[in-house]
Amino acid sequence: MAFSASLFRTKTVHTEDALCPRSAIQAEQPPNIIDCIPVAGYEAALVTNALFLLVLFVFNPLTCKGNWIKAILFYSLLLYNMILAIFLVIDTQHFVSALLLAYVVTFLILWTADRVRLSCAVGSVLPFVDMRSSYIRVDNGNSSVVVPMNHTKHWFIRNFEQSCHCENCFYIHSSSYVECTFISRLKKSILVSVCDFSLGGNVSTVFVPSSDKTVPLHIIAPSKLYV
């Protein structure tokens, strides 16, 4: 229903019909006649935005595929509002369309600036298709790879069984590291190997931030590591 163009087509009504606010009255028309979009159109747009935003805030996937779906939902919301704003411009609803365009453009600028900054930091376009904001970048001398992380703590444990089935995840857990870096919105830390331990027949390595100071280390050995 919210995607039906008929909901947003203007209708000419008498002012006493109260289908839309009086601010929509056009100067060239008689005082008792107005062109407006029915209230149902605005309600549909608000409900659609509310549902999309609710899903984006509540949906917190642990896997790469889930985060790609979340990114698609986000871009779909921006596209929906952009198309709606263009449709309102065509129907001469300039005030409402201007507000909607300002909302979309402002949101898009802030999002793009954040993603560009992260992309430059990690050296990959992955932040544009993955909604997470913490990444591990590893370099084995011949090549490097970036893997998004669910947690915001700058530590990393490799060689655990994990539910992420991306090729990058398997690469990062089998690679011999030359450099390992944790990158997020607020910090960029070089990680160093501090200890190895055996779990389920697999030898795992703990990485923590490189620091001259004492680094608190708390290891809880899970059966799975989500990345």
UniProtKB/Swiss-Prot annotation:
A GO cellular component annotation in the UniProt record: host cell membrane
The residue ranges of the CoV 3a-like viroporin TM domain are: 27-130
Using the UniProt record, give the first listed, main subcellular location: host cell
Topology relative to the membrane: Multi-pass membrane protein
Key words, A-Z: Host membrane, Membrane, Transmembrane, Transmembrane helix
Q: Where are the transmembrane segments?
A: 39-59, 71-91, 93-113
Q: Please name the InterPro entries in this protein's record.
A: a/bCoV_VIROPORIN_3A-like_CD, a/bCoV_VIROPORIN_3A-like_TM, MERS-CoV-like_ORF5
Q: Which PROSITE patterns match?
A: COV_VIROPORIN_3A_CD (PS51967), COV_VIROPORIN_3A_TM (PS51966)
Tell me where in or outside the cell this protein is found. Answer: Host membrane
Please state every residue range assigned to the domain named CoV 3a-like viroporin CD: 134-191
Q: What is this protein called?
A: Non-structural protein 3d
Q: Supply the source organism for this entry.
A: Bat coronavirus 133/2005 (BtCoV)
